[in-house]
A protein has these predicted regions:
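Small-residue-rich hydrophobic transmembrane alpha-helices
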Residues: 1-34, 72-91, 180
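Helix-loop interface residues and adjacent transmembrane-helix termini in multi-pass membrane transporters
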Residues: 8-9, 84-85, 111-114, 118, ...
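Residue-level signature of transmembrane alpha-helical cores of multipass secondary-active transporters
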Residues: 26, 65, 91, 95, ...
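Short membrane-interface helical motifs at transmembrane helix boundaries
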Residues: 32-63
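Helix-terminus/linker motif at the lipid-water interface of multi-pass membrane proteins
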Residues: 45-52, 108-115, 176-181
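Cytoplasmic helix-loop-helix junction between adjacent transmembrane helices
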Residues: 50-58, 62, 69-96
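Membrane-interface helix-loop junctions in multi-pass transport and translocation proteins
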Residues: 89, 99-132
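Interhelical loop/hinge segments that connect adjacent transmembrane helices in multipass membrane
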Residues: 124, 135-176
Length: 181
């Protein structure tokens, strides 16, 4: 998203391809997580320290939410692009309402509808869809400078974009490690 803003400010014709490029690479990378979620959820839970009971309880949960990996990634991407395109209030609303959706629908799906852990997984899996939908408000507005210009995925451009995001990535990974530990 930062590279998009820099290129847009330089009036570069390449600026419009960054959003599409990010979405495509997120999908490509998410295929790994979908594969792990579908075929190795028990191994993943065990790797993260789950005992046999946790593996049994969390297997379906992990399988469901890992299949929604593209949506989690797209939500982060949409949020970053909207924020960097000058609309931090929409980005914050997307984060807030997707989190609230998760909390409320965890309860609704688990207890009144009796879906147990699968219901919790569905609530978690669908929450980024809410965030993306809210970000679409910005994309449809006249204020948006983001265009969905199809471009071929480029590994070189991916590395170029990732240079700026390394510090955020380290922060996210650190947060995850601290949570697990």
């Amino acid at each position: 998203a930062i590279r998009f803003v820099v290129e847009r400010n330089k009036k570069s014709p390449d600026a419009d391809g960054y959003f599409f490029h990010a979405l495509v690479w997120a999908f490509i990378i998410s295929l790994f997580f979908i594969f792990v979620g579908l075929f190795l959820p028990d191994k993943l839970i065990a790797l993260l320290g789950g005992d046999a009971q946790i593996v049994a309880t969390g297997k379906n949960y992990t399988r469901i939410f890992m299949c929604f990996a593209p949506f989690f990634m797209w939500n982060y991407i949409c949020n970053a692009f909207v924020r960097n395109d000058g609309n931090p209030s929409i980005a914050m609303s997307a984060t807030l309402f997707s989190s609230l959706f998760n909390i409320v629908f965890d309860y609704i799906l688990m207890f009144p509808l009796g879906l147990s852990m699968e219901g919790a997984a569905l609530a978690t899996a669908l929450s980024p869809v809410i965030g993306i939908a809210i970000c679409c408000i910005h994309f449809q507005s006249k204020k948006s400078t983001i265009r969905l210009k199809p471009v071929l995925p480029s590994f070189r451009r991916l590395l170029y974009c990732c240079q700026v995001g390394v510090s955020s990535f380290v922060g996210e990974i650190s947060s995850g490690v601290i949570t697990v530990v």
